[in-house]
From Swiss-Prot:
GO process terms (BP): doxorubicin transport; positive regulation of GTPase activity; positive regulation of mitochondrial fission; positive regulation of protein phosphorylation; regulation of Cdc42 protein signal transduction; small GTPase-mediated signal transduction; xenobiotic detoxification by transmembrane export across the plasma membrane
GO cellular component: a single term: spindle pole
Record's protein name: RalA-binding protein 1
rRNA-binding is among the record's keywords: no
Pfam families: RhoGAP (PF00620), RLIP76_Ral-bd (PF20924)
Residue numbers spanned by region Mediates association with membranes and could form transmembrane domains: 154-219
Chain positions with Phosphoserine modification: 29-30, 34, 48, 62, 92-93, 461, 463, 638
UniProt: ATP binding residues: 69-74, 418-425
Post-translational modification remark: Tyrosine-phosphorylated upon stimulation of cells with EGF.
Residue stretches of biased makeup (Polar residues): 24-33
Residue ranges of the region described as Disordered: 1-158, 525-552, 598-648
UniProt free text on domains: The Rho-GAP domain mediates the GTPase activator activity toward CDC42.
Chain intervals for the UniProt region annotation (Mediates interaction with REPS1 and REPS2): 500-648
Length: 648
């Protein structure tokens, strides 16, 4: 039995019946107006209308009637939930409205009629749901009513808020479109030809290998020789992908934070992603042919000749890889990896057959005996501005670190000039420049200390009795060094005094500006207090004013936060400017020293010509004595000597 929930008034079926011909209207049957169907239409004492002929007498109650009674109770409960609806068996079609005979025969509401076995079966299989279109219409109607209620409840302030929120949502969509057009794409390192990766990520020491390969091999040489099943056990994929993404961005992650299996998987991934075979397509068949030679000597000679024909980068990477894996095989007791295991792992990775790999591993000394795995030293970092980094102590260490930093500086300049806008690279550029300034200053101090120790040792070893002309010549060199140091110190002091005067003038102007700003702040505060006292009498507790105050408070907090960020940037810029000034002072000192040396070299030939013109009267003064006199005269004439005692 299907149930269609039909509204009591203006249903579509009634309209169709009314529109058809003969103007006949359907009279409700006795079942449709039964008191059990519509309780409340009849009084309780009145007898109910006669039932249909198909119903059985009430005294015989069968099992079917009991089941039917249960269904009737359920139907009554459902009626209470849906008031104003009637349950019909079928909607009357237009054909029924046309013929009156059909109207009389039409069975109305068969709720209490005992169905036959076939009808009961049909009723159980019919669907008791509304059509989908009617449900969709009802949902739309409910949504429209909900929107109408909301629009009625909204106030003017809510409408303004909604308009502002829509405006804010629209604005940021248009802004980020412009920088996305200019941002160049960063090329990856994995999957590119070996020569390109070498040109982009080669280390400072000039070894033509990619940085990812060098760093992975160094790490595995340190930490992977005691790991069981190395290069056979795979690392964690998420960590391998993380390292791969970092190297693709041309960063240098700290591999010490990862496990050996993860780094080994990263190295295998790089070798697997190489677009070309290490032995090249042209030479690969010839390597296979060389494996078929009869004697081992012929195999080695043919392999040596073929390896010389390989490109430089391919030959170098292959030699480093074979030597490194030979170290792994040498630690077989700890790594559990022999030649067979390494060949099984490496063959699908580098696309080289097991026969060729076996020859390479069994003749490492003959083929790659001169290869030495050079350890990479990372450049010095100065991440924390509050502390000074630990600089090398010896001159050789300082010069080596300067070479590393200058190589890194050139790479950063090349990337930034290529159009790649990266804030992290710009910050690293400033960091490298600061480190270079500190290293050069430390190198000068080390040279000065070395000269002083040399002079002290020479003075201590000298004795007054054993003074000769050869020793005097050696002392002249010491005197010249001392004079050069004195000149350098004097010129540097002059530049520092000039910088001091400039900074004092700047400080005075800044103090005046601070006083002016304080006066303005005091004046504004007094005006605000005066304005508050006037407005307190006429102030009203309106919602709009409180909202404006909240917005102003938010704007004020935002401005304060921006001001703090600008102050931090200003401090960084001031530090950088100060370092650049120090570098300029050093360059000026060097220029002045070069000018003084050039002037001395021009004066020396003139002094040598004068005694020749005089006829050789009197012996020429010693060069060392002349230099001492010239230095003393310059020291007297220089104004920096009078300023030595002035505090800086």
């Amino acid at each position: 039995m299907t149930e269609c929930f039909l509204p009591p008034s203006s249903s579509p079926s009634e309209h169709r019946r009314a529109e058809h011909g003969s103007g006949l209207t359907r009279t409700p049957s006795s079942e449709e107006i039964s008191p059990t169907k519509f309780p409340g239409l009849y009084r309780t004492g009145e007898p109910s209308p006669p039932h249909d002929v198909l119903h059985e007498p009430p005294d015989t109650v069968s099992d079917d009637d009991k089941d039917h009674g249960k269904k009737k109770g359920k139907f009554k409960k459902k009626e209470k939930r849906t008031e104003g609806y009637a349950a019909f068996q079928e909607d009357s079609s237009g054909d029924e409205a046309e013929s009156p005979s059909k109207v009389k025969r039409s069975k109305g509401i068969h709720v209490f009629k005992k169905p036959s076995f076939s009808k009961k079966k049909e009723k159980d299989f019919k669907i008791k749901e509304k059509p989908k279109e009617e449900k969709h219409k009802e949902e739309k109607h409910k949504e429209e009513k909900h929107k109408e209620k909301k629009s009625k409840d909204l106030t003017a302030a809510d409408v303004v808020k909604q308009w502002k929120e829509k405006k804010k949502k629209k604005k940021p969509i248009q802004e980020p479109e412009v920088p996305q057009m200019d941002a160049p794409s960063v090329k990856p390192i994995f999957g590119v030809p070996l020569v390109d990766a070498v040109e982009r990520t080669m280390m400072y020491d000039g070894v033509r290998l990619p940085a990812v390969f060098r760093e992975c091999v160094d790490y595995m040489e340190k930490h992977g020789m005691k790991c069981e099943g190395v290069y056979r056990v795979s690392g964690i994929k998420s960590k391998v992908d993380e390292l791969k993404a970092a190297y693709d961005r041309e960063e240098s992650p700290n591999l010490e934070e990862y496990e050996p299996n993860t780094v080994a998987s990263l190295l295998k991934q790089y070798l697997r992603d190489l677009p070309e075979n290490l032995l090249t397509k042209e030479l690969m068949p010839r390597f296979e042919e060389a494996c078929g030679k009869t004697t081992e000597m012929e195999k080695v000679q043919e392999f040596q000749r073929l390896l010389r024909e390989l490109p430089e980068c391919n030959h170098l990477l292959l030699s480093w890889l074979i030597v490194h894996l030979d170290h792994v095989i040498a630690k077989e007791l700890e790594t559990k990896m022999n030649i067979q295991n390494i060949s099984i792992v490496l063959s699908p990775t580098v696309q080289i057959s097991n026969r060729v790999l076996y020859v390479l591993f069994t003749h490492v000394q003959e083929l790659f005996g001169t290869v030495v795995l050079k350890q990479v030293t990372r450049p010095l970092r100065w991440s924390n501005m509050a502390t000074m980094p630990t600089l090398p102590e010896t001159q050789a260490g300082i010069k080596e670190e300067i070479r590393r930093q200058e190589f890194l500086l050139n790479c950063l300049h090349r990337d930034l000039q290529g159009g790649i806008k990266d804030l992290s690279k710009e910050e690293r550029l400033w960091e490298v420049q600061r480190i270079l300034t500190a290293l050069k200053r430390k190198l000068r101090e080390a040279k000065r200390q070395e000269c002083e120790t040399k002079i002290a040792q020479e003075i201590a070893s000298l004795s007054k009795e054993d003074v000769s002309k050869e020793e005097m010549n050696e002392n002249e060199e010491v005197i010249n060094i001392l004079l050069a140091q004195e000149n350098e110190i004097l010129t540097e002091q002059e530049e520092l005094l000039a910088m001091e005067q400039f900074l004092r003038r700047q400080i005075a102007s800044e103090k005046e500006e601070i006083d002016r700003l304080r006066a303005e702040i005091a004046e504004i505060q007094s005006r605000q207090q005066h304005g508050r006292s006037e407005t307190e009498e006429y102030s009203s507790d309106s919602e709009s004013e409180s909202e404006d105050e909240e917005e102003l408070q938010l704007i004020l907090e935002d401005l304060q936060r921006q001001n703090e960020e600008l102050e931090i940037k200003n401090n960084h810029l001031n530090q950088a400017v100060h370092e650049e000034r120090e570098a300029i002072i050093e360059l000026r000192v060097q220029l002045r020293l070069l000018q003084m040396q050039r002037a001395k070299s021009e004066q020396q030939p003139q002094e040598e010509e004068e005694p020749e013109r005089r006829g050789g009267i009197g012996p020429p003064p010693c060069d060392g004595v002349l230099e001492v006199r010239v230095a003393k005269e310059q020291a007297k004439a220089s104004p920096s000597k009078d300023r030595k005692e002035t505090p800086i």
